[in-house]
């Protein structure tokens, strides 16, 4: 991301606008390096850090639009709408919902793992099916599909039988199918958390 930071600094200087906003699309999933690999996670993490650390940098998520063999997914309109909403809210001051949901905290209550989330009032899946894209990960990196249910703004799963799992992750792999959206049809931001 050093090059991205340098580009932003150069453009802000060239346009004589130290607050010039930047809008970026978090890299989509692609199976080039293998469906189970997580090479692109580092890129996504760096993009997230860029948004969190730099002023006037806003990011939208595209993982839900991913295609296994195309780094530039064909579904351009939803991405354009997400970027437009971000610009309307942040550059033009409009009251528009643009933030993708994020996991704000992870807690264990009895035998349940609870993911508390921000920027969501309700959840649904784009295909009407069960929530897809979550995995438990043990200390050796072995992944096992995690089954979650929506409960209000939180996501809940039973961990009573997953005694070796140390992490839960979502949209971390180079490519995996995901279908979870908030009430504004915005996808959950990729994450990995220890519990």
Question: What residue ranges belong to the model's regions?
Answer:
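Alpha-helical scaffolding within the catalytic cores
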Residues: 2-10, 38-48
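Hydrophobic, well-ordered secondary-structure elements that form the walls
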Residues: 11, 83, 168
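Short glycine/threonine-rich loop-to-helix capping motif typified by GTGT followed
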Residues: 30-40, 73-76
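Active-site neighborhood of glycoside hydrolase catalytic domains
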Residues: 1-24, 54-56
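C-terminal beta-sandwich/jelly-roll accessory domains of carbohydrate-active enzymes
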Residues: 114, 119-195
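Catalytic cores of secreted or luminal carbohydrate-active enzymes
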Residues: 44-132
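Solvent-exposed loop/turn segments at secondary-structure junctions
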Residues: 28-32, 64-67
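Generic beta-strand/beta-sheet core signal
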Residues: 23-27, 60-62, 171
């Amino acid at each position: 991301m050093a090059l991205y930071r340098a580009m932003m600094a150069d453009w802000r200087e060239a346009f004589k606008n130290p607050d010039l906003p930047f809008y970026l699309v978090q890299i989509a999933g692609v199976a080039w390096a293998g469906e189970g690999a997580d090479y692109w996670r580092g890129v996504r993490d760096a993009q997230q850090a860029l948004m969190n650390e730099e002023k006037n940098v806003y990011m939208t998520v595209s993982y839900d639009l991913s295609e296994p063999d195309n780094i530039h997914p064909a579904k351009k309109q939803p991405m354009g709408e997400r970027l437009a909403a971000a610009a309307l809210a942040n550059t033009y001051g409009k009251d528009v919902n643009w933030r993708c949901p994020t996991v704000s905290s992870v807690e264990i209550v009895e035998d349940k793992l609870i993911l508390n989330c921000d920027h969501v009032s309700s959840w649904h899946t784009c295909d009407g099916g069960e929530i897809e894209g979550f995995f438990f990960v043990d200390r050796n990196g072995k992944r096992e599909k995690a089954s979650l249910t929506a409960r209000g703004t939180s996501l809940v799963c039973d961990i009573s039988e997953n005694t070796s799992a140390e992490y839960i992750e979502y949209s971390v792999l180079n490519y995996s199918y995901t279908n979870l959206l908030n009430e504004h049809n915005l996808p959950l931001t990729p994450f990995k958390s220890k519990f």
